[in-house]
Amino acid sequence: MAFTAMTVAPSALADLVLAQKSGCTVCHSVEAAIVGPAYKDVAAKYRGDAAAQDRLVAKVMAGGVGNWGQVPMPPNAHVPAADIKALVTWILGL
């Protein structure tokens, strides 16, 4: 069995740590859907959508249901707005 080294950019690692600290990774991961969609699926769905950043920041703050099935995403009032914006920017860049 061979192992390969994985290089992760420091900013990407910092954003993943922020997602963990904010509680996002309870329901989401980068590669695979858990309760909510995978971050890479979110990035693919909104690629090229100029309004996605603002819309997703509002959705993460307020929560909601219906964009990815019927499992609701709770509001995230405990997460600072600047952190939500940073997370959405990171996710859309995947």
Curated annotation (Swiss-Prot):
Protein's name in the database: Cytochrome c-551
SUPFAM superfamilies registered for this protein in UniProt: Cytochrome c
PROSITE patterns per UniProt: CYTC (PS51007)
InterPro entries for the chain: Cyt_c-like_dom, Cyt_c-like_dom_sf, Cyt_c_ID
Lineage, top ranks: Bacteria, Pseudomonadati, Pseudomonadota, Gammaproteobacteria, Chromatiales
Modification after translation (UniProt): Binds 1 heme c group covalently per subunit.
Pfam families listed in its UniProt record: Cytochrom_C
Keyword rRNA-binding part of the UniProt annotation: no
Keyword entries, A-Z: Electron transport, Heme, Iron, Metal-binding, Signal, Transport
Ranges that cross the membrane: none
Annotated residues for binding of heme c: C24, C27, H28, M73
GO molecular function: electron transfer activity; heme binding; iron ion binding
Residues annotated as signal peptide: 1-14
The protein's role, per its UniProt record: Efficiently couple electron transfer between the cytochrome bc1 complex and the photosynthetic reaction center.
